[in-house]
Protein backbone atom coordinates (compact mmCIF):
# COMPACT_ATOMS: atom_id res chain seq x y z
CA UNK A 1 0.00 0.00 0.00
CA UNK A 2 1.33 3.43 -0.94
CA UNK A 3 2.00 5.24 2.32
CA UNK A 4 5.02 7.52 2.36
CA UNK A 5 6.75 8.19 5.65
CA UNK A 6 7.32 11.82 4.66
CA UNK A 7 3.55 12.31 4.90
CA UNK A 8 3.81 11.82 8.66
CA UNK A 9 6.77 14.17 8.81
CA UNK A 10 4.86 16.86 6.94
CA UNK A 11 1.98 16.39 9.39
CA UNK A 12 4.50 16.72 12.23
CA UNK A 13 3.39 13.48 13.85
CA UNK A 14 4.69 9.96 14.31
CA UNK A 15 1.37 8.28 13.61
CA UNK A 16 -2.23 8.90 12.55
CA UNK A 17 -4.87 8.18 15.19
CA UNK A 18 -7.68 7.48 12.74
CA UNK A 19 -7.05 6.64 9.09
CA UNK A 20 -10.26 6.83 7.06
CA UNK A 21 -11.12 5.56 3.60
CA UNK A 22 -12.89 8.51 2.04
CA UNK A 23 -15.18 6.85 -0.52
CA UNK A 24 -16.24 3.28 -1.32
CA UNK A 25 -14.50 2.04 -4.43
CA UNK A 26 -17.50 -0.03 -5.50
CA UNK A 27 -20.70 1.11 -7.18
CA UNK A 28 -22.93 2.60 -4.49
CA UNK A 29 -25.01 5.81 -4.21
CA UNK A 30 -22.67 8.80 -3.85
CA UNK A 31 -22.53 12.56 -4.48
CA UNK A 32 -26.17 13.17 -3.67
CA UNK A 33 -27.49 10.00 -5.29
CA UNK A 34 -29.94 8.01 -3.19
CA UNK A 35 -30.88 5.04 -5.37
CA UNK A 36 -28.61 2.05 -5.99
CA UNK A 37 -28.22 1.31 -9.71
CA UNK A 38 -26.80 -2.17 -10.52
CA UNK A 39 -26.24 -1.09 -14.12
CA UNK A 40 -23.31 1.01 -12.89
CA UNK A 41 -21.51 -1.98 -11.40
CA UNK A 42 -17.70 -1.92 -11.68
CA UNK A 43 -14.77 -3.90 -10.25
CA UNK A 44 -13.57 -3.03 -6.75
CA UNK A 45 -10.91 -4.18 -4.34
CA UNK A 46 -12.21 -6.76 -1.86
CA UNK A 47 -12.41 -5.36 1.69
CA UNK A 48 -10.14 -8.13 2.92
CA UNK A 49 -7.30 -6.91 0.68
CA UNK A 50 -7.82 -3.34 1.85
CA UNK A 51 -7.76 -4.38 5.50
CA UNK A 52 -4.64 -6.48 4.97
CA UNK A 53 -2.83 -3.44 3.57
CA UNK A 54 -4.04 -1.25 6.43
CA UNK A 55 -3.05 -3.93 8.94
CA UNK A 56 0.56 -3.53 7.83
CA UNK A 57 0.40 0.16 8.67
CA UNK A 58 -1.13 -0.64 12.05
CA UNK A 59 1.63 -3.17 12.76
CA UNK A 60 4.24 -0.59 11.75
CA UNK A 61 2.73 1.93 14.15
CA UNK A 62 1.90 4.42 11.41
CA UNK A 63 -1.83 4.35 12.05
CA UNK A 64 -3.78 3.29 15.13
CA UNK A 65 -7.38 2.91 14.03
CA UNK A 66 -9.31 2.49 10.77
CA UNK A 67 -12.50 4.26 9.74
CA UNK A 68 -14.75 4.42 6.71
CA UNK A 69 -16.55 7.36 5.13
CA UNK A 70 -19.63 7.75 2.93
CA UNK A 71 -20.45 4.12 3.60
CA UNK A 72 -23.59 2.00 3.57
CA UNK A 73 -24.58 -1.11 5.58
CA UNK A 74 -23.44 -3.67 3.00
CA UNK A 75 -19.98 -2.18 2.69
CA UNK A 76 -19.49 -1.83 6.43
CA UNK A 77 -20.68 -5.41 6.93
CA UNK A 78 -18.05 -6.66 4.46
CA UNK A 79 -15.27 -4.92 6.36
CA UNK A 80 -16.47 -6.22 9.72
CA UNK A 81 -16.83 -9.77 8.42
CA UNK A 82 -13.34 -9.70 6.89
CA UNK A 83 -11.85 -8.40 10.13
CA UNK A 84 -13.60 -11.09 12.14
CA UNK A 85 -12.77 -13.98 9.80
CA UNK A 86 -9.14 -13.12 9.11
CA UNK A 87 -8.16 -11.47 12.42
CA UNK A 88 -7.61 -8.07 10.83
CA UNK A 89 -8.06 -4.59 12.36
CA UNK A 90 -11.70 -3.71 12.93
CA UNK A 91 -13.33 -0.54 11.62
CA UNK A 92 -14.11 1.75 14.57
CA UNK A 93 -15.98 4.64 12.95
CA UNK A 94 -17.92 5.86 9.94
CA UNK A 95 -17.83 9.47 8.72
CA UNK A 96 -21.10 10.14 6.89
CA UNK A 97 -23.19 13.25 6.20
CA UNK A 98 -25.74 14.03 8.89
CA UNK A 99 -27.76 17.18 9.46
CA UNK A 100 -31.27 18.54 9.77
CA UNK A 101 -31.52 18.19 5.99
CA UNK A 102 -29.97 14.74 5.68
CA UNK A 103 -30.96 12.17 8.29
CA UNK A 104 -30.40 9.09 6.14
CA UNK A 105 -28.15 7.71 8.89
CA UNK A 106 -31.13 7.21 11.17
CA UNK A 107 -32.48 4.31 9.11
CA UNK A 108 -30.38 1.19 8.57
CA UNK A 109 -26.98 2.63 9.53
CA UNK A 110 -28.09 3.74 12.99
CA UNK A 111 -29.19 0.31 14.18
CA UNK A 112 -26.32 -1.46 12.43
CA UNK A 113 -23.62 0.74 13.96
CA UNK A 114 -25.22 0.81 17.40
CA UNK A 115 -25.31 -2.98 17.57
CA UNK A 116 -21.77 -3.27 16.18
CA UNK A 117 -20.44 -0.42 18.36
CA UNK A 118 -19.28 1.70 15.42
CA UNK A 119 -19.04 5.45 16.05
CA UNK A 120 -20.62 8.08 13.80
CA UNK A 121 -18.49 11.11 12.94
CA UNK A 122 -20.97 13.29 11.05
CA UNK A 123 -19.77 15.75 8.44
CA UNK A 124 -21.71 18.63 6.88
CA UNK A 125 -23.82 19.30 9.99
CA UNK A 126 -24.43 22.74 8.48
CA UNK A 127 -25.30 21.32 5.05
CA UNK A 128 -22.59 23.26 3.20
CA UNK A 129 -23.58 26.40 5.10
CA UNK A 130 -27.22 26.34 4.01
CA UNK A 131 -28.39 25.82 7.59
CA UNK A 132 -26.57 28.99 8.67
CA UNK A 133 -29.29 30.89 6.85
CA UNK A 134 -26.80 32.99 4.90
CA UNK A 135 -28.23 31.97 1.53
CA UNK A 136 -31.69 32.97 2.70
CA UNK A 137 -30.36 36.46 3.34
CA UNK A 138 -28.23 36.55 0.20
CA UNK A 139 -28.63 33.77 -2.40
CA UNK A 140 -25.30 34.79 -3.94
CA UNK A 141 -23.37 34.83 -0.67
CA UNK A 142 -19.79 33.65 -1.01
CA UNK A 143 -19.38 29.94 -0.34
CA UNK A 144 -18.90 26.54 -1.94
CA UNK A 145 -22.54 26.39 -2.99
CA UNK A 146 -22.24 29.51 -5.17
CA UNK A 147 -18.57 29.36 -6.18
CA UNK A 148 -18.44 25.77 -7.47
CA UNK A 149 -21.13 24.89 -9.97
CA UNK A 150 -22.67 21.48 -9.31
CA UNK A 151 -20.69 21.03 -6.09
CA UNK A 152 -23.70 20.67 -3.81
CA UNK A 153 -26.14 18.57 -5.84
CA UNK A 154 -27.84 17.00 -2.83
CA UNK A 155 -28.78 20.47 -1.59
CA UNK A 156 -30.44 21.52 -4.85
CA UNK A 157 -33.29 19.04 -4.44
CA UNK A 158 -36.95 20.07 -4.00
CA UNK A 159 -37.92 20.98 -0.47
CA UNK A 160 -34.46 22.09 0.65
CA UNK A 161 -35.11 25.88 0.55
CA UNK A 162 -38.43 25.47 2.36
CA UNK A 163 -36.90 23.27 5.05
CA UNK A 164 -33.98 25.67 5.56
CA UNK A 165 -36.40 28.59 5.96
CA UNK A 166 -38.51 26.63 8.44
CA UNK A 167 -35.51 25.71 10.58
CA UNK A 168 -34.24 29.30 10.48
CA UNK A 169 -37.63 30.56 11.68
CA UNK A 170 -37.65 27.93 14.43
CA UNK A 171 -34.20 29.03 15.59
CA UNK A 172 -35.29 32.66 15.77
CA UNK A 173 -38.39 31.73 17.75
CA UNK A 174 -36.20 30.01 20.35
CA UNK A 175 -33.55 32.72 20.56
CA UNK A 176 -30.93 30.80 18.60
CA UNK A 177 -29.08 31.52 15.40
CA UNK A 178 -29.79 29.09 12.54
CA UNK A 179 -26.25 27.76 12.88
CA UNK A 180 -26.68 27.13 16.59
CA UNK A 181 -29.89 25.19 15.98
CA UNK A 182 -28.30 23.07 13.25
CA UNK A 183 -25.22 22.22 15.29
CA UNK A 184 -27.01 21.71 18.60
CA UNK A 185 -29.34 19.26 16.89
CA UNK A 186 -26.35 17.15 15.85
CA UNK A 187 -24.53 17.60 19.18
CA UNK A 188 -27.61 16.39 21.06
CA UNK A 189 -27.96 13.06 19.24
CA UNK A 190 -27.07 10.12 21.48
CA UNK A 191 -25.35 8.25 18.64
CA UNK A 192 -22.93 11.03 17.61
CA UNK A 193 -19.36 10.50 18.81
CA UNK A 194 -17.87 13.74 17.47
CA UNK A 195 -18.82 16.35 14.89
CA UNK A 196 -16.79 17.71 11.98
CA UNK A 197 -17.31 21.44 11.66
CA UNK A 198 -15.91 24.02 9.28
CA UNK A 199 -15.39 27.77 9.44
CA UNK A 200 -13.94 30.47 7.21
CA UNK A 201 -13.65 33.08 9.96
CA UNK A 202 -13.04 33.30 13.69
CA UNK A 203 -16.60 34.54 14.14
CA UNK A 204 -17.97 31.41 12.49
CA UNK A 205 -15.70 29.21 14.59
CA UNK A 206 -16.84 30.92 17.78
CA UNK A 207 -20.50 30.44 16.82
CA UNK A 208 -19.85 26.76 16.07
CA UNK A 209 -18.23 26.21 19.45
CA UNK A 210 -20.84 28.21 21.37
CA UNK A 211 -23.56 26.01 19.91
CA UNK A 212 -22.40 23.28 22.28
CA UNK A 213 -23.85 25.20 25.23
CA UNK A 214 -27.02 26.27 23.43
CA UNK A 215 -30.26 25.14 25.12
CA UNK A 216 -32.22 22.17 23.82
CA UNK A 217 -35.71 21.31 25.02
CA UNK A 218 -38.48 18.80 24.40
CA UNK A 219 -40.46 21.57 22.71
CA UNK A 220 -37.58 22.24 20.34
CA UNK A 221 -37.18 18.53 19.65
CA UNK A 222 -40.87 18.24 18.78
CA UNK A 223 -40.75 21.30 16.55
CA UNK A 224 -37.80 19.82 14.64
CA UNK A 225 -39.74 16.57 14.26
CA UNK A 226 -42.75 18.46 12.89
CA UNK A 227 -40.63 20.22 10.27
CA UNK A 228 -39.01 16.94 9.33
CA UNK A 229 -42.38 15.32 8.69
CA UNK A 230 -43.33 18.19 6.39
CA UNK A 231 -40.06 18.13 4.40
CA UNK A 232 -38.83 14.62 4.99
CA UNK A 233 -35.08 14.19 4.47
CA UNK A 234 -34.89 16.62 1.53
CA UNK A 235 -31.13 16.28 0.91
CA UNK A 236 -30.13 12.59 1.15
Identify the residue ranges that each predicted region occupies.
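Beta/alpha (TIM)-barrel catalytic core signal, keyed to glycine-rich beta->alpha loops juxtaposed to Asp/Glu
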Residues: 24-227, 231-235
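Metal-dependent phosphodiesterase/phospholipase catalytic core, i.e.
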Residues: 16-18
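Phosphate/pyrophosphate-binding loops at sites that engage ATP/ADP/AMP, CoA/4′-phosphopantetheine
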Residues: 5-14
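Surface-exposed loop and adjacent secondary-structure segments within mature catalytic domains
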Residues: 21
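Short, small-residue-biased leader/transition segments that mark boundaries at the very start
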Residues: 1-2
Amino acid sequence: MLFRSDWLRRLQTDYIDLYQLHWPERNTPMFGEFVYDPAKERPFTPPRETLEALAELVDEGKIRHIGLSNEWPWGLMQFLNAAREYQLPRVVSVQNPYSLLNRTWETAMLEFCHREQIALLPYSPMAFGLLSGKYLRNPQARGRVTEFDGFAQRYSKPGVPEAVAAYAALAEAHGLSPAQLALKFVYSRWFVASTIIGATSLAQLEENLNAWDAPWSEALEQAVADIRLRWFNPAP
